[in-house]
UniProtKB/Swiss-Prot annotation:
This is Mannitol-1-phosphate 5-dehydrogenase. It comes from Klebsiella pneumoniae. InterPro entries: 6-PGluconate_DH-like_C_sf, 6PGD_dom2, Mannitol_1_phos_5_DH, Mannitol_DH, Mannitol_DH_C, Mannitol_DH_CS, Mannitol_DH_N, NAD(P)-bd_dom_sf. Coiled coil: none annotated. It catalyses: D-mannitol 1-phosphate + NAD(+) = beta-D-fructose 6-phosphate + NADH + H(+).
Length: 382
């Protein structure tokens, strides 16, 4: 089995590329960073530091690399069995023309073997977006063939890849946390389902997308906002503060009650998942700065994101939301000289007051009880 992976950055090498290579798949990375490409082709291997309770160093070997903007990558798309990406949501559009060319070449060669493409990005239904970009670049006469032979498989990914802690100038060395989760929509594959250790197949991907958003992302953000208010530097420092931990765990339990109601998750398994997430926040090797995690508060306070979306679920089902509201109030206090959204948030609150500002950002009704509750919490923190 052969795979092509777009994006030889830390996530690509430390997470998806590692799982593919560990599964014995013949792996080629595609990237624009010539230093990384040269190092991969000189060594055909690299080291991954897996950090957690037990630190270990794994060697990933038997890998190759090509430029993602040359002819070689087009030829590879025409012959591999799997294409994966970890390039960042914005770059998906940039790699689509090369994928379209490779698929057209595959058709011209008469290759009937199915190919599955999986975007492994921190976004909802990233592969479906990539498919749209690819189809925009395809000739009209190739579209029906691609629809019949190429699987565009959505996935949800979760692994924290912090800046490398080791004092090394090796462009290939990467540090990752022990935890990893790669869940793919099995209903979208063409041909036989692959067996790749570390890849989980599901027919209900949105349940897992929301589980991550409502637990990891909600908890991470609230830890950052309360941590910043309390003067903590890192996520670990913040989550070890008992007062903060109680609110964060409470918020994740409130959002969890929504998931249990909506998707019939097992309550005990979900409680264990929450504890696992709290353990990840405590990882001493992940030097996660509260300011980095808290940035872009306008996006994080928007209706479809990690704070308001679970809150809307509690309102829909008539469930408690006391701790989620505390987290929202803390987010309204987020200030950072390096973050334009934090400055815009401060200006909006100064101009309109917290009630109207929160309603405008979140889409919540300014006259609602829940906005009044958040404003009370916001004022109490002044």
């Amino acid at each position: 089995m052969k795979a092509l992976h777009f994006g030889a950055g830390n996530i690509g090498r430390g997470f998806i590329g590692k799982l593919l290579a560990d599964a014995g798949i013949e792996l080629t990375f595609a990237d624009v960073n010539q230093t990384v490409l040269d190092a991969l082709n000189a060594r055909h291997s690299y080291q991954v530091h897996v950090v957690g309770e037990n630190e270990q160093v794994d060697t990933v070997s038997g890998v190759n690399a090509v430029s993602s903007i040359g002819d070689e990558v087009v030829d590879l798309i025409a012959e591999v069995d799997v294409v994966t990406t970890a390039v960042g949501p914005v770059a998906l559009e940039r790699i689509a023309p090369a994928i379209a060319k490779g698929l057209a070449q595959r058709k011209a060669q008469g290759t009937e073997r199915p190919l599955n493409i999986i975007a492994c990005e921190n976004m909802v239904r990233g592969t479906t977006q990539l498919k749209g970009h690819v189809f925009n670049a395809l000739a009209e006469e190739d579209k029906a063939w691609v629809e019949a032979h190429i699987g565009f498989v959505d996935s949800a990914v979760d692994r924290i890849v912090p800046p490398s802690a080791s004092a090394t100038h090796d462009p290939l060395e990467v540090t990752v946390e022990t935890f990893s989760e790669w869940i793919v929509d099995k209903t979208q594959f063409k041909g036989a389902l692959p067996t790749i250790p570390g890849m989980e197949l599901t027919d209900n991907l949105m349940a897992f997308v929301e589980r991550k958003l409502f637990t990891l992302n909600t908890g991470h953000a609230i830890t950052a906002y309360l941590g910043k208010l309390a003067g903590h530097q890192t996520i670990r420092d913040a989550i070890l503060d008992k007062k903060i931990r109680a609110v964060v765990q409470g918020a994740m339990e409130e959002s969890g009650a929504v998931l249990i109601k909506r998707y019939a998750f097992d309550p005990q398994k979900h409680a264990a998942y929450i504890q696992k997430i709290l353990g990840r926040f405590e990882n001493p090797y992940l030097k996660d700065d509260v300011e980095r995690v808290g940035r872009q508060p306008l996006r994080k306070l928007s209706a479809g994101d990690r704070l308001i979306k679970p809150l809307l679920g509690t309102l829909e089902y008539g469930l408690p939301h006391r701790n989620l509201v505390k987290g929202i109030a803390a987010a309204m206090h987020f200030r950072s000289e390096d973050d334009p959204q934090a400055q815009e948030l401060a200006a909006l609150i100064a101009d309109k007051g917290p009630q109207a500002a929160l309603a405008q950002i979140s889409g919540l009704d300014a006259a609602s009880d829940v906005v009044a509750e958040a404003v009370n919490d916001y004022n109490a923190e002044k």
